[in-house]
Amino acid sequence: MASFATIAAVQPYSAVKGLGGSSLTGAKLFIKPSRQSFKPKSTRAGAVVAKYGDKSVYFDLEDLGNTTGQWDLYGSDAPSPYNPLQSKFFETFAAPFTKRGLLLKFLILGGGSLLTYVSASSTGDVLPIKRGPQEKPKLGPRGKL
């Protein structure tokens, strides 16, 4: 457990409750920090060097596969395994949606048309004034309305 001197040194002008008066509304006792201040030890100055690969080699002409990446993994000269009709369909109809702006316009138009359809097919008797009275009116004292 930390001693009182350590707490006073770390927290300058800390208030201690409950030392004077009642324990509920005790007077605060202010403690001055000790003359001994906490100073970090001197830091060493030096250049920061990032390590990449083995022995800080950034580009290796002898090993271009690891330097530039394995491009053979992704490119293939083999024919497409998909049906040509399916490929043509997706190239034709999905091409406009490759850009963000066109996709956003499509979503806005779709959302607007959905909102229009829902509002047109909803019933208009939502407000009480449109629905009219729901219960039979109560008769007055002489049996009249």
Swiss-Prot record:
The keyword Membrane applies. It comes from the Eukaryota. Signal peptide: none annotated. Keywords: Chloroplast, Membrane, Photosynthesis, Photosystem I, Plastid, Thylakoid, Transit peptide, Transmembrane, Transmembrane helix. The chain crosses the membrane at residues 102-122. The keyword Transmembrane applies. One of its GO terms (cellular component) is chloroplast thylakoid membrane. This is Photosystem I reaction center subunit VI, chloroplastic. It comes from Brassica campestris.
